[in-house]
Amino acid sequence: TRCGIPKERLIATGIPVRQIFFTPGSRSESRAALGIPADKRVALLMSGSMGCGPIKRLARRLTEMLPEEGMLIVICGHNEKLYESLLELGNRSNLRVLGFTKEVPAYMDAADLMLTKPGGLSSTEAAAKGLPMIFIDAVGGCEGRNLEFYTRYELAETADSVNRLAKLVCTNLADPEKLRSMSQALRVNFRHNGGVEICDVLTKGRRVST
């Protein structure tokens, strides 16, 4: 390679994530545990720790456009500024705003689709769960390449404005068959946990199968 490392010494494993993301969860049980109505069509919005992008404008537009059975859940993580900003949207019946939570896997199980930046970790976690994704506000470099990969193979979608993103969410929530197809494609393409494979290589000297 350009850095002088022989090609045969490089092993592509994928990004390691916790095994729980590769463990299928029950949507009905997760919704019951999280207090999410069983009949809702749920969009989960996660913006990463930096809270980049038009998160507040997108959340506002989605709450205005979602059908009666639609619901938006926003997880802000440790971004207190974003959390406080979203609370300014007021008490909207189709919006739930959370700060940090350890229940991200359960929220992914409960959701119908997820909006997120195409960062490596979040997208890998969602892909392992088979959760269809819509990407927002990609940053150049690795995020741009992630977006290109996912969209090229129809594993995720994106749009270039708040209005188009909101419309895309509503369109997908109204098409369960399309969401099932995307979910199945993700599960087929993200079967292996990079963390397990890395441990196998380090402890057993075994190369990852391709």
Question: Where are the model-predicted features located?
Answer:
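Donor-nucleotide binding loops and adjacent catalytic segments primarily
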Residues: 27-29, 34-110
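C-terminal alpha-helical cap of glycosyltransferases
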Residues: 191-210
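Conserved donor-nucleotide binding/catalytic region of nucleotide-linked donor-dependent transferases
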Residues: 26, 157, 162-163, 170-187, ...
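Short, conserved active-site loop motifs that form the nucleotide-linked donor/cofactor pocket
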Residues: 10, 94-96, 154-156
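A donor-sugar binding/catalytic signature common to diverse glycosyltransferases
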Residues: 106-145
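Short, glycine/polar-rich helix-capping loops at beta-to-alpha or helix-loop-helix junctions
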Residues: 1, 81-86, 122, 141-147
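Donor nucleotide-sugar binding/catalytic pocket of nucleotide-sugar-dependent glycosyltransferases
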Residues: 1, 6-21
